[in-house]
Regions:
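Conserved HGGG/HGGXW glycine-rich cap/lid loop of the alpha/beta-hydrolase fold
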Residues: 18-72
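Gly/Ala-rich beta-loop-alpha elbow adjacent to hydrolase catalytic centers
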Residues: 103, 107, 111
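Catalytic active-site module of serine/aspartate enzymes centered on a nucleophile-bearing elbow/loop
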Residues: 234-284
């Protein structure tokens, strides 16, 4: 399905042994691009209404998850850490060393993982209608059995505009969803098994905007409050709407997101004493503490980058091993088939003589 905006372009990029379908909308500004991480089973077209409504100064990068849309289906299920490293390589291949990251629903967990593994490559983080993971989230209220069996509208499951204006949901998502019976959808589900960021939230150091709807039946508003309470530099905004307002009513959230991305650095004043070049002895206790904290943060960031590179190398080695194993298995099958054919021919010759 082509991207509607003529200024956008699509391409296939290779990262970590797999190929990803990517759509890029160039921006007129000079800031980092905004990387969008979709919900489960959604092609990159799902957030087209949001992209169309977003400030044209912001460059936007979207992708299909492995096994979704035009991206290659991996040979084995993957973990969020694997995909976070693939995205890092993808951004590098596209010429970007840093990006702002927005994740919605399933993509919110991926966005958190990306921020944790790539602290210097994620400038700001936006989490929309998401949680810490399927096993540590506050679950939705179960539907009464009768209503569960005879849902009058699909929008009842999504809440907000999807419920009051089902045509908006159809326009936004009908052609962007993949079948929940597909292997790509299954891999996205298995990636979430056992995944949680709950104990790691204090390690997310980026400025973070948490957006959660007060009529979201899938991920209740309490989950957004948990994220905002656990992430040190998070701002919470509870909007009146459901799970997919970003696609069905982008005008509701786009101004908040644009303002958040354009705001000056949260810690600009705090970083100033460390940049003056004065000796620590000439600084006050608060300035010395800030300088020490800055140095510790830089060291932790470097260590995290080193770990991410090591994990990426391990993933590449795993991919190479899988390829070699598949080639060896194919060669073994061929050898067995040739041996069986030779044995059959020998038996036939013996019988003929």
């Amino acid at each position: 399905m082509p991207v509607r905006d003529d200024s956008e372009r699509e391409q296939i990029t290779r990262a970590g042994g797999t190929t990803l379908r990517v759509a890029i909308r160039p921006g007129t500004g000079t800031g980092p691009p905004l990387l969008l991480c979709n919900g489960i089973g959604m092609r990159l077209e799902a957030l087209q209404p949001f992209v169309d409504a977003l400030d044209p100064a912001i460059e936007v990068i979207r992708f299909d998850a492995p096994g979704v849309g035009g991206s290659q289906l991996p040979s084995l299920p993957y973990r969020p850490t694997t995909l976070a490293l693939l995205l890092r390589q993808m951004l590098h291949n596209l010429g970007h060393q840093q990006a702002d990251v927005l994740g919605i629903s399933w993509g919110g967990g991926l966005a958190q993982q990306f921020a944790l593994l790539n602290p210097r490559r994620c400038r700001r983080l936006i989490l929309v209608a998401t949680a810490t993971g399927p096993h540590t989230m506050v679950p939705p209220n179960p539907l009464p059995p009768a209503k569960n069996l005879i849902l009058r509208r699909w929008g009842d499951l999504w809440g907000g505009t999807a419920k009051t204006d089902p045509d908006a949901l159809a326009r936004a998502l009908r052609k962007a969803r993949i079948s929940p019976l597909s292997l790509g959808y299954l891999y996205q589900n298995t990636a979430a098994l056992g995944f949680t960021t709950l104990p790691l939230l204090p390690l997310i150091r980026q400025r973070t905007l948490v957006l959660t709807g007060d009529d979201d039946p899938i991920i209740p508003v309490t989950n957004g409050r948990i994220l905002a309470a656990g992430i040190p530099h998070a701002t919470l905004h509870v909007y009146h709407g459901g799970h997919v307002e970003l696609a069905t009513r982008p005008s509701l959230l786009t101004p908040l997101i644009t303002s958040f991305l354009a705001a000056p650095p949260h810690d600009a004043r705090r970083a100033e004493p460390a940049q003056t070049g004065r000796h620590p002895e000439d600084q006050g206790p608060r300035q010395v503490a800030d300088s020490t904290a800055t140095a510790q943060a830089a060291q932790a960031s470097a260590e995290a980058d080193a770990l991410a590179e090591a994990l990426q190398g391990a993933h590449a080695a795993q991919q190479a091993a899988e390829t070699a194993a598949a080639q060896a298995a194919a060669a073994l099958r061929d050898a067995r088939e040739r041996a069986a054919a030779a044995q059959t021919a020998a038996h036939q010759q013996a019988a003929a003589s």
